[in-house]
Amino acid sequence: MTSRLHVCSRPLTTPLDLNAVCRGDGLLFVRDGVGVAGRGSAIACDENSILNVLNEVASVDDQTDAPHAVVAFGVKPFAREAPARFIIPEILVHKRADGSHSVSLIGTDPQLLTEARLSAVVADMASTRPNPPSVNSFTVEPLTPVDTYLSAVMAARDAVRRGDIDKAVIARDIQVRSSQPLDVYSILLRLRASFGSSYRFHIGGFLGASPELLVERQGRIIRSHPLAGTAPRTGDATVDARLAAELVASIKNQIEHRVVIDMVHDTLLPHCSYLDWEPEPSIVTVANVQHLGTALEGALVEPPLTALALVDMLCPTPALGGHPTHEAMDLITKVEGMDRGDYGGAVGWIDGLGDGTWAVAIRCAQLSADRTRARLFAGGGIVADSEPHSELAETQAKFQAMLSAIVRP
């Protein structure tokens, strides 16, 4: 039986940099400076027990609001049958959209959760700087053979043309080898510089910068912003505008996008008193690519589902799996030739009220235990008009997000 957790929390008058809190071995989930970071592990558990653990957290004093003071960082793997896993940190810093900041100490012994220790922890996080990164050499190699990937794309395209499925997402993986352990702190800083408006995360050696909001719950209000349909960005404004216009006009990409939006909308609607969505997709830009995106917002009926329940219902969306879900997933298992692990699942956080924010686990890497290897993933939606070598080029563009952050002298 796990001992009950306790928490001591205080507002921060001087904000802390969430990257500095995470450093290279902590926990991070942040977008545009808003999010959570943590250090240590007060408890690790799966989705079958996490809500009970959060609901039983006790405040050490009347200045601490336990349901708001503790969050669990979570990863939901791609495989639907695989449970999400969670970590509640010993030290948590929360930067909210309203500008408020707080720091919490979490543990099983309330006598150790004092205001004096909290002040010492804040001082340590504010003053400690990670060691400068070492000089590394790198090699990059495919894990999924290119021919295997191209064959899988053709198999998925043929299945769509036969009418077996509407869409399937086919992915591949590559590996980066480093002569020295990778410096996670520096990688996260590079991701912030290039992808600050993406959801940047690090949980147990799984890190990335996802541009796609799977679901966010704040009380009864929920939001989602699915992305599907991709074009490159060159840095030339004229060229990028032309590519964006071609993306919007592309029947292939509009079909791919519509499949995703319809699934997310139809999944959420029965649980909402209303659910609004943009009538037409818009362009969502990140550093090196641009996507078709459609924002949805609604209000949950009472009693509202938790963020975790919403994640379980939506994950994986057709943006990473396909449609119909079971048929597409069966095809992926048959032809893709790899175990995706956490790629294509979801990553985020949940609190004791059931609120949380979760991103689709893309533009990501899984580090080896010794941090000398990083496994990177990229994929694309396959429909009837998909061309295998164009899909291959799209995955290469998507790999660049993590490659440019990892492979540095």
Predicted regions and their residues:
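Conserved hydrophobic core element of enzyme catalytic domains
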Residues: A295-P409
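Contiguous alpha-helical scaffold segments within structured protein domains
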Residues: M1-L12, D32-C45, P110, A116-M154, ...
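Non-catalytic accessory segments adjacent to catalytic cores
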Residues: N52-V176, H271-Y274, V407
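Short coil/turn segments at secondary-structure boundaries
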Residues: R31, D166-A171, F201-G204, E280, ...
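An anion-binding catalytic pocket shared by soluble metabolic enzymes
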Residues: R31-V34, G38-C45, R80-I91, R172-I255, ...
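Extreme N-terminus nucleophile/cap motif
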Residues: M1-V60, D164-I165, R177-R190, S194-G196, ...
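A residue-level signal for conserved active-site and pocket-lining positions in enzyme catalytic cores
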Residues: G74, V93, G163, V215, ...
